[in-house]
């Protein structure tokens, strides 16, 4: 009998490969970030509902979340590069925060406000997220990435789905 389950494989891929991660196609002129985060909200609520059902079906079931992971290292020790790495990590970790802690982190809400993104959510949605958090966190680790406060200055390298700045300390 299987007792360990994942609701969405690499749920954060919706931000990096929207069609592959959630089947999203954008209309011309559409606010793509708005659409991605609204779809992410629906996936997070669906995950909470699936977690609820899994626990009702068999109290021994353990349900987890799953992330395509890999830390973002700052390109230099310059504060803007350190901050850029943190911001890139937060874009991915926010999915874990919602699924494991049961609410949207303040840093995500503040970033949405800065970008003019308004995610429609009901009180019922928020209660489902709060009441049905995951039992464990899992991830696929593909590669580390490098972030800079000024990526235009830096040499980019491609790896899997994520593009990143070239890490000058690693051989390719």
Task: Spell out what each predicted region is.
Residues 1-172:
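Active-site region of glycoside hydrolase catalytic domains
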